Amino acid sequence: PIEPVLSGGGQERGLRSGTQNVAGAVALAIGLNESNARMQAQYRELVASRDMLIDAVRRVAPRADLTGDPERRLPGHASFIFPGVTGEALLVDLDARGIAASSGSACAIGRHEIPATLLAMGLEPSIAKSALRMTFRKPLTREQVERISLAIEESYTDLTRH
């Protein structure tokens, strides 16, 4: 049987007694509107950070190819193919330089497989295994983007030299 949430009067067929909390409902609506405005502002900041990062990577590694649609993409996400190196080698080298990234999809962390998402996009396995994915949930500063792009430039240059 269904038990009443609150005891008391007979509102809601005796299952939920009490007067509706109008002030609480209004406060909730105001809070949701403010939260939505903050989310939209953060979305714009993430898009600007992502685009700044993409531009910086393209500047320091012109051979790198951005994966996915150039316009319709997640705000805090950039994925590249780096010809001539494996994503795993690039990942290890970047980690040694203090940069955290991934060579596969977020749902496959810890597995050493070719990213299924890239294969589904039509990339050949030999190309897909040279992927590097960078994700962030807070906007990046210009200094952070420069640090990341410098590390990518040095790492990619070192790895393609050998």
Where are these regions (language model features)?
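Structural signature of PLP-dependent enzymes
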Residues: 32-55, 65-74
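Conserved PLP-binding catalytic core of the aspartate aminotransferase-like
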Residues: 65-116, 120
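Short, solvent-exposed beta-strand edge segments and adjacent coil->beta transition regions
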Residues: 10-12, 75-77, 129-133
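Hydrophobic C-terminal alpha-helix "anchor/cap" residues
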Residues: 57-58, 94
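Conserved core segment of the aminotransferase class I/II
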Residues: 1-43
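A general structural signal for well-ordered alpha-helical segments in protein cores
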Residues: 22-25, 32, 50, 54, ...
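PLP-dependent enzyme catalytic core of the Aspartate aminotransferase-like
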Residues: 109, 113-162
